[in-house]
A protein has these predicted regions:
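A short, proline-enriched helix->beta-strand linker immediately N-terminal to the Walker B motif
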Residues: 184-188
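Conserved ABC ATPase "signature" region
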Residues: 88-89, 141-160, 269-270
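Conserved ABC ATPase signature
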Residues: 164-169, 173
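Short catalytic/signature loops enriched in Gly
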Residues: 14-16, 33, 156-160, 250-338
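Conserved ABC transporter NBD signature motif
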Residues: 78-89
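P-loop NTP-binding/switch modules centered on Walker-like glycine-rich loops
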Residues: 55, 191, 195, 199-280
Length: 338
C-alpha cells in the first residue's frame, strides 16, 4: 500500500511540445557553404517561454525558420536534425503537412511589422485570411472574430480600425495587429522574432506585457528570439545563447543571470547599459563574429574573448556543449570558461 501511494505521487517527466535535436542548416552560395546553424538542440514545454539570444548573424532566426520550412531552398538546405512537434518531425514533414501546422498550431511574429503587413490590403483582409485557410471561416463570422482579436490586443475602436490600412497605424499598433494575426487561430506555439526591436522602450514594454497576458489567457508556449538579455531576463524561463551558429550556453534564466559561465554570455551581460555606473565607458565586445563560410576547428570566440582567458582557448578542435552543472550547459572551452 505504501508503494502504491508513493507511485501515485511520482509524476512522469513533462513531454516537450517541441523537441529540436541537432538541427543543422547551411546555405550553399557561390562564395561557399555558409554554416548558419550547426547541431542546435533545444526543447519547449507546454506553457513555457524560452529565449534564443545572440548577436545578429548568430543563427537565431534561421533556427526557427528551419522548423517551419521558411528557409528558401536553394540556397538553404537542412542537412540534418529532428524537430518533433506533437510527434510530427517538422524537418521531414511534407509541405502539405507543414501548411496545416504553420499559421494554425505554430504562429510567428516577425521583426518589422511594416514590412510583414501587406500595405495594399486592409487589416480586415489580412486578419481573416488565416481563419479562412485554417478553419474555413468566412464572411461576418470571420470579421467578428477578427474584431475580437484586435480588442484582445488593446486596439481601441476595433470595429472601425479593422477597415484601415497598415500605414494608418503607429509602429506599436502595427505590432499589436501582428500579434492579433499570429494568435487569431489560437496556436499552441508562438515564435516571436525580435517582436519589440523597432519600438521605443515604453511601447516595447507594452508589447511584451501583452504577449505575457495573451500567453496566460491561451496557455501557449513562446520562443522569444532577441539580442536583448534584459528582455530575456524578464520574460523567459529557459535561455539558449547562440554564437556563430551554435549554442554556447543554455540554462534556466535564473541560473544563467546569476552564474553565467561562457565568456560570450558574460560579455553580453557586461554590455547591458544598466550594469554600468554613470560616467563609465560602455563595454562593447571587440571584433566581429567569424566568417561562417569557414567551418572552425577551434574555439570560434577566441579572437574576441577579453572576459575569459583567450590564451587557453581551444586551437586544435571545436568545443562541445557540455553539462557543467545540473541543467546548466556550456561549451567546454577552457579559455571561455576561465
Amino acid at each position: 500500500m505504501i508503494v502504491e501511494s508513493w507511485a501515485l505521487k511520482v509524476q512522469p517527466p513533462a513531454v516537450p511540445l517541441l523537441d529540436v535535436r541537432n538541427l543543422t542548416t547551411r546555405f550553399h552560395t557561390r562564395a561557399g557553404i555558409v554554416h548558419a546553424v550547426e547541431s542546435v538542440s533545444f526543447s519547449v514545454e507546454p506553457g513555457q517561454t524560452i529565449g534564443i539570444v545572440g548577436e545578429s548573424g548568430s543563427g537565431k532566426s534561421v533556427s526557427c525558420y528551419s522548423l517551419l520550412g521558411l528557409v528558401p531552398q536553394p540556397p538553404g538546405k537542412i542537412h540534418s536534425g529532428q524537430a518533433l512537434f506533437d510527434g510530427i518531425d517538422l524537418l521531414q514533414a511534407s509541405e502539405k503537412t507543414l501548411r496545416t501546422i504553420r499559421g494554425k498550431r505554430i504562429s510567428m511574429i516577425f521583426q518589422d511589422p511594416m514590412t510583414s503587413l501587406n500595405p495594399y490590403l486592409k487589416i480586415s483582409k489580412q486578419l481573416t485570411e488565416p481563419l479562412e485557410v485554417h478553419e474555413g471561416m468566412k464572411g461576418p463570422e470571420a470579421l467578428q472574430r477578427a474584431i475580437e482579436s484586435l480588442e484582445e490586443v488593446g486596439i481601441p475602436d476595433a470595429a472601425q480600425r479593422i477597415h484601415s490600412y497598415p500605414h494608418e497605424f503607429s509602429g506599436g499598433m502595427r505590432q499589436r495587429v501582428m500579434i492579433a494575426m499570429a494568435l487569431i487561430t489560437r496556436p499552441e506555439l508562438l515564435i516571436a522574432d525580435e517582436p519589440s526591436t523597432a519600438l521605443d522602450v515604453t511601447v516595447q514594454k507594452q508589447v511584451l506585457d501583452l504577449l505575457r497576458e495573451r500567453q496566460k489567457a491561451l496557455g501557449l508556449s513562446i520562443i522569444l528570439i532577441t539580442h536583448d538579455l534584459a528582455v530575456v531576463s524578464e520574460n523567459c524561463e529557459m535561455v539558449n545563447v547562440m554564437y556563430a551558429g551554435r549554442i554556447v550556453e543554455k540554462a534556466s534564466a535564473n541560473e544563467l543571470f546569476s552564474n553565467p559561465l561562457h565568456a560570450y554570455t558574460r560579455a553580453l551581460l557586461k554590455s547591458i547599459p544598466a550594469t554600468h555606473q554613470r560616467g563609465d565607458e560602455l563595454y562593447t565586445i571587440p571584433g566581429i563574429p567569424p566568417d561562417l563560410s569557414q567551418q572552425p576547428d577551434h574555439c570560434s570566440f577566441s579572437t574576441r574573448n577579453t572576459i575569459g582567458d583567450s590564451s587557453r582557448c581551444l586551437t586544435d578542435h571545436r568545443p562541445e556543449l557540455t553539462e557543467i552543472s545540473d541543467g546548466h550547459y556550456a561549451q567546454n572551452c577552457p579559455g571561455c570558461l576561465a
